[in-house]
Amino acid sequence: MMRHSSLRLIIGGLILLLFVLNVFSKEQGSHSHKRSHSAKRFSRDSNSARERRPNIILILTDDQDVELGSLNFMPRTLRLLRDGGAEFRHAYTTTPMCCPARSSLLTGMYVHNHMVFTNNDNCSSPQWQATHETRSYATYLSNAGYRTGYFGKYLNKYNGSYIPPGWREWGGLIMNSKYYNYSINLNGQKIKHGFDYAKDYYPDLIANDSIAFLRSSKQQNQRKPVLLTMSFPAPHGPEDSAPQYSHLFFNVTTHHTPSYDHAPNPDKQWILRVTEPMQPVHKRFTNLLMTKRLQTLQSVDVAVERVYNELKELGELDNTYIVYTSDHGYHLGQFGLIKGKSFPFEFDVRVPFLIRGPGIQASKVVNEIVLNVDLAPTFLDMGGVPTPQHMDGRSILPLLLSRNRAVRDNWPDSFLIESSGRRETAEQIAESRARLQIERRNMKLANSSLLEDFLEGAGESTTIVSSSSTAATLMSSTAQQPEDGEEEVETDNEEDDVDGDGAMDSSAAALEEDDLDDAAFEEGDEELDQEFQQNNDLPLAPYITKMMRLNSECSDPALLKNCLPGQKWKCVNEEGRWRKHKCKFHLQLEHQLAAMPRKQYQRNCACFTPDGVVYTKIRAPSAGLHRVNKRTHNGPGRRRNKREVFHTELPDEMEELLDLHQVVDQLVDHTHRSKRDLPASSNETIAQVIQQIQSTLEILELKFNEHELHASNSSGNSYERGEKYTKSGGHRCFVDATTAKVNCSNVIYDDEKTWRTSRTQIDMLIKLLKDKIGKLKEMKKQLRESNKQALAAGRRNDNRRRNDQSVLDSGAGPEFNMSYFTEISSTPRSNVVGQTEVFQGYGSASAFDSLEQTQSHRFTPRAECYCEPDVGENHADSKEMAREARRKLKEERQRKKERKRIKKARLEKECLSEKMNCFSHDNQHWRTAPLWNDSPFCFCMNANNNTYSCLRTINGTHNFLYCEFTTGLITFYNLTIDRFETINRAAGLTPGERSHMHDALDQLKSCRGRSCSIRRHQNHLEGGSSAPLLPINQVHRNNKRKHSPLAGAVGNYAFVGPRLDMEALPPIKRRKLSKYNRLTGSQQSHMKRRPWKQTPLQQSPRFLRTHSVTPAQA
């Protein structure tokens, strides 16, 4: 028994052990299976993950329309994307303006949520960078494991100083669209391009960089998904096409829609009421602009095919979503508007939208609404990332991949269209101003406290200086595109973006006006301040004054060196104050300094005449009296320098000359009156003044004549000659009444400064009086000719005789040698040591001076001067020359800008209008063929009161546009019966209809996130009638279709054809669909036409009214 019991125990233990082992092995297997499944689920590099997360490519154009038929001239794109994928017939932008629309595309938010109102207001601002830019679809997909790349235009005010978050490969265009002469930020390095098609044509470079990004991404990690954005500048201005396409698409008139040149429009907003019909030159311009736009799109068409072929070669075509769309539409002549965007009509808000990818049925047509705010949620859905709550859009993948009818039935049928510009009320404007003033006051207080800490603590000072030095280094190493505009060929005046500026309301204008009042910058550093403000990512140092900022920035040793290639700024210390200069003017400054004439009196010289007279030329002191303080014009084409002479004692004759100078000025003012008002005694008065001046001048010349004779008698010792005369009258010379000789003080001969001062005084007065004599003679001549009866020949001869006596002493040579009063000559000095230099005097431009100079050359022998070696110019003179060279460069730049300003003002003189945005066009706007050879013109295409909010609804029963303007105007367009929106039917709305649409619009204007999606049937009018008739040109949702070749599609550039939605009809009355006739390729054989009756109850009594609007209702 014991043996059996023990045996049973052993067997039971074995069984229990086997059972435990079995359970344990199962548990291990289940855990290993879970781990492998989890690894497959979350591994980014697994095959299953690769299948779930496809590649995403967005191809974005700029200003491409649908209503004008531009997409029909891109056969490659239509064949690869439309025929190979799906087409959304109702794709719209929520704001028809570049920067707001692109900001909505990146963030999936309406304008009233991301706060980018215009192309200038908050576009790529620090606020945008800190809040919304960090939440773009690129950041979410990059964090989810996608390799992201962006190439092309980004935002209009992107300055290239940073790389937006979320993009691993970055090639963003700096500022607005261009095809040549642009700069890009390529992975943090700024690259400037020129005007060479082979190297610089931007659409081709975008395609090349994108293809290189795809190749490198798959070579590095073939299983990692890719997000690529290709943002082309076409067909935005300046519409520079590739040379091989410049001969295509002439005489294309697809933009001549029924609303083309439909002007004026008294039932629409103010800008359309005042717009007159286009002139013939305007129509020619729209035709040529349409041609150039189509030509630029050919490069995009080729790029789409290149990317398609590259994906095919890489084996990624079936695993890649390719989305093709535009930021907004465009108009050319519609309602008399020559060109532009920013209107809520179909031609500005409707955009092309094509998509192909895994799971998308080929040649599929989708009639549900898709918006630009839906792109970001769609991309996140493609990548398996849940849509954030702040995004206003929704993913469109269910429309493409799901066959559930409930998805289409619940899809939103209404959306919001917002114009660019703020919409604050008067109370909000006042609140914004008060808040801005408080912020400025707080900033000043913070700066004052920071300054105290800056002065007290040395450590903090070092920190501030080091951070500012880093900022200065970054600024000196970067070159901003807008500041280099003077050296570039300006090919785009950006008048297309003027639309956004006009939509700004009074609040933004008031804030800008306040900012202008506070911007008090000095002229020399204005461009520096602009660049400092544009670099948004640099640390903001709260400097109190500009001098503090310059002291901090110029502490960087890199800015103290001479200008090197690629260096932009250079710091120069001028008299203890730092100044920043642009290096691009450095070479010009050197050339100016090399070409400037040098002064002659820079060396000490001894001069000898053939008569044995010896005199010296002594260098003037560095702070001498030769500095130019004022420039006066003395006639056309001639300048003279007027020196200030500070003296304490003047001779009596000089004081008399100063009094005479005032008398002459009074006579000049007196003769400015008309000749008939001058009295007959004016001639006699002028003659008396001339005689008085000449007598005083003779005394002065007599003094210097005696001085010259005295100098020749004592040439052996020039400092002993003053000892023969007694000192009298202070530091000056005087005429002895008894001997009629000139006596001078010894100080004049011993002190060089006193001698030079005395000489300069007399020299100045002599030249001044000679000028006055010339003017008085001209005045006298005019009076003598005008008064033929008064002046006798004797007085004229007497005046001539007196003039001859004052100039020449009959046969005795000149009384007075002008070589003592020689001014600085413009002849450059020579650097050869010991070279003979000849100094010659010159007088004024009057007849007296020219006669004296002629006589001086005739009777005075030429002197030879020997000068000491050149030791180089002193510091003061070199600074003066550099200052003069900079002044000349500045004047040259100012003249260049002034010429441009005058030319622009001349072109825009007739089209400028208050609170309107206008542009001018001439033959200088386009630089590539085909050129504009017609006459220039101006046109105003938008106004700042064109600010609106619109409700757009498209469903099975209704197709309308309801708008409310800030001016109080209400417009309503029924596109079911008026597809081109030519008639405003707001007067025909009932109060209930208007109230319902107003409430729906208010709901959308303040919506956020999910509340921005209004479900279908929720927006139907009160007492909703269910009319079976769809909007015109409606297509069945799930209908597959083929398209004819391009030649057949050009004529029918809009919808394929009218269809009827038969889902609302009973099955017995539905039309039967026929198969597509592949032999004929006809687009009209989708349905077999069968007449059917429509009961009166099936028609909508509200929106099918065709009565016209009376003038009173309009």
Curated annotation (Swiss-Prot):
It comes from the Eukaryota. Residues 466-479 have a biased composition (Low complexity). Residues 1-25 form the signal peptide. Residues 483-502 have a biased composition (Acidic residues). Binds 1 Ca(2+) ion per subunit. The keyword Calcium applies. The modification 3-oxoalanine (Cys) is found at C98. It is an enzyme of class 3 (hydrolase). This is Extracellular sulfatase SULF-1 homolog. It comes from Drosophila melanogaster.
